[in-house]
Regions:
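Long, compositionally biased
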Residues: 10-11, 66-91
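Amphipathic, hydrophobic secondary-structure cores in small proteins
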Residues: 38-40, 44-70
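Residue-level detector of well-ordered alpha-helical segments, enriched
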Residues: 29, 47, 76-79
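Intrinsically disordered, low-complexity segments enriched in small/polar residues
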Residues: 1, 23, 55, 86-87
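N-terminal, charged low-complexity regulatory/assembly segments
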Residues: 30-33, 61, 82-83
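N-terminal amphipathic/basic-hydrophobic helices that include classical n-h-c signal peptides
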Residues: 1-18
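N-terminal acidic leader/helix
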Residues: 13-45
Length: 91
């Protein structure tokens, strides 16, 4: 088993971001957002999930899926951060 290079990891992330901008199911989209939020803010997946759950980020994604899943992923991550901050989050 070998570790992925940084370039391979970036390519995988880029592919996932492109897929997110296409039609994904709600569960897939929420999972992708949790993963990308974790990566962007250097959190583990469980910590990212708990943070987004506690400060209504996941609720926001659930309520606004129809609009959010067609926006660029970076915009959704920015909005998630803002929603969480409005609800007491400190990232």
């Amino acid at each position: 088993m070998h570790a992925e290079s940084v370039a391979e990891q970036f390519d995988n992330r880029k592919y996932l971001a492109i897929m997110a901008e296409k039609t994904l199911g709600k569960i897939d989209f929420v999972n992708l957002c949790i993963s990308e939020f974790a990566w962007k803010y250097k959190l583990s997946m469980p910590v990212s999930y708990r943070y987004l759950q506690k400060y209504d980020g996941i609720g926001f994604l659930d309520r606004n899926y129809e609009a959010e899943h067609i926006l660029p992923l970076q915009e959704t991550l920015k909005t998630l951060r803002q929603v969480c901050q409005q609800n007491g989050g400190t990232l």
